[in-house]
């Protein structure tokens, strides 16, 4: 992902304030609620029968944190996202058979959740930088798909 120095600084500064567990759980939960077909990949998570069940599900929260921990790792390697996410791409492609479009959807949901959490601090410039990052991560995660 090509970010200007200013964009990298904005992404890094905001990310330092992100509560990964809270934001990750909310982002994954919102994905599962807004795009219910994505729930099929999470059969082992138990009750996903309603928005409140999804949003309060401890397995959703835990996996959301795991997702954002990986995203955090990606932020450390913006110039080599394909390499950073190669194993996860392979896992999601070959073993889990996740539609790569879901990565884009989750990235967009994450941007919305960040905007909700940070309000005025999430300026149009910060949003634009994050849109570049989530698009780059989605592309990297889709890399192993044929």
UniProtKB/Swiss-Prot annotation:
Q: Which residues carry this modification: S-nitrosocysteine?
A: 93
- Name a GO molecular-function annotation: oxygen carrier activity
**Which residue positions does Phosphoserine occur at?**
44
Q: Name one GO cellular component term.
A: hemoglobin complex
Binding locations of heme b: 63, 92
Query: Does the record carry Protein biosynthesis as a key word?
Result: no
SS bonds (residue pairs): none
Q: What are the record keywords, sorted? A: Acetylation, Heme, Iron, Metal-binding, Oxygen transport, Phosphoprotein, S-nitrosylation, Transport
- This protein's record includes keyword Heme: yes
PANTHER family xref list: HEMOGLOBIN FAMILY MEMBER, HEMOGLOBIN SUBUNIT BETA
List the InterPro entries.
Globin, Globin-like_sf, Globin/Proto, Hemoglobin_b, Hemoglobin_oxygen_transport
What Pfam families does UniProt report for this protein, alphabetically? Globin
Where in the sequence is Phosphothreonine found?
Answer: 12
* Oligomeric form and interacting partners: Heterotetramer of two alpha chains and two beta chains.
Q: What protein am I looking at?
A: Hemoglobin subunit beta
N6-acetyllysine is found on 59, 82, 144
The similarity annotation says: Belongs to the globin family.
Positions of modified residues (N-acetylvaline)? 1
